[in-house]
Swiss-Prot record:
Component of the DASH complex consisting of ASK1, DAD1, DAD2, DAD3, DAD4, DAM1, DUO1, HSK3, SPC19 and SPC34, with a stoichiometry of one copy of each subunit per complex. Multiple DASH complexes oligomerize to form a ring that encircles spindle microtubules and organizes the rod-like NDC80 complexes of the outer kinetochore. DASH complex oligomerization strengthens microtubule attachments. On cytoplasmic microtubules, DASH complexes appear to form patches instead of rings. InterPro entries: DASH_Dad1 (IPR013958). This is DASH complex subunit DAD1. The keyword Nucleus applies. GO terms for biological process: attachment of spindle microtubules to kinetochore; cell division; mitotic sister chromatid biorientation; positive regulation of attachment of spindle microtubules to kinetochore; positive regulation of microtubule polymerization; protein transport along microtubule to mitotic spindle pole body. The keyword Glycoprotein does not apply. Its main location: nucleus. The lineage of its organism: Eukaryota, Fungi, Dikarya, Ascomycota, Saccharomycotina. It comes from Eremothecium gossypii (strain ATCC 10895 / CBS 109.51 / FGSC 9923 / NRRL Y-1056). Keywords: Cell cycle, Cell division, Centromere, Chromosome, Chromosome partition, Cytoplasm, Cytoskeleton, Kinetochore, Microtubule, Mitosis, Nucleus. Coiled coil: none annotated. One of its GO terms (molecular function) is microtubule plus-end binding. Belongs to the DASH complex DAD1 family. PANTHER family: DASH COMPLEX SUBUNIT DAD1 (PTHR28025:SF1). Signal peptide: none annotated.
């Protein structure tokens, strides 16, 4: 708290001057308390921002994993997945309908070649 000279001990000040000094001291006290409040609120904001940044950093690895997954889908396959998928050479060349008709017992359908 900033205080000027004690008004009661200074007899040379006139009444308007005393009033001015009192009002100035009140304003300085109000400004000081407001600045303290602003500083405390800024510290709270800083802590909140640091916490949100920390949470964001915790999700970086998850974000990177999803990025690799998405890039793999965009490129057709993720690295190392192409070997696990059957190629078109491994697929049977007969139509699927022929197998379904034979299983249903339709005699009109050609028998599957083996």
């Amino acid at each position: 708290m900033i205080m000027s000279k004690d008004i009661a001990t200074t007899p040379e000040l006139s009444e308007p001057d005393k009033y001015f000094v009192e009002q100035r001291d009140l304003l300085l006290q109000e400004i000081t308390s407001t600045l303290d409040s602003i500083l405390n609120n800024l510290n709270g904001l800083n802590i909140s921002l640091e916490n949100s940044i920390a949470v964001g950093k915790e999700f970086e690895s998850v974000s990177e994993l999803w990025k690799v997954f998405y890039d793999g889908l965009a490129n057709g396959a993720a690295p190392g997945v192409a070997a696990a998928n059957p190629s078109s050479q491994d697929l049977p060349t007969e139509p699927v309908a022929a197998h379904q008709n034979a299983a249903a017992g339709n005699s009109d359908a050609p028998a599957p070649s083996q």
